[in-house]
Amino acid sequence: GVPILDYESVLEAQVEVGLGPLHTQFGPDGYAYTSLFLDSAVARWSIGAEGYRPQDGWSLISKIPVQYNVGHIATAEGDTVSPDGNFLVSLNKWSVDRFMSTGPLLPQNFQLVDISQQGDNLQVLYDMPFTGGEPHYAQIIRADKLNAWDVYPEVGWNPLTQSVDPNA
């Protein structure tokens, strides 16, 4: 019962961004960002929506090298209808010879990229080793959008069911 759409009939554009494109996130200013596994880079490209695009639509604007072999990337609310923020985090799979040895497994690493400037102005701001296994998927949300509790609403609160639980 699920309709199968013809690929060519629903294709708006196809932007050649580089080798090994994997994941795409969006910024608040009309740019999209795609991780390039084989290029070890993140591509910035302009989307084509008239009145929204910052530069020529559907075109590669720039690439920023990351180390090494990026998989997932995350921008603030970058996979929603209203992306928000000035930063991208590149979740890189390899960090060969970049950080102190932590044992037989090499750490992966995250890189914080400033995406606040227009055009080809991208800058890596920070590198962080990460030893929690290969990084997969992340969400970034502005802190002022969270309504965090300082304490649970009631004694015996189960955070999984969001209710009082006699076994909690």
Regions found by a protein language model. Name each.
Residues G1-A168:
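Predominantly soluble domains enriched in secretory-pathway, periplasmic, or organellar proteins
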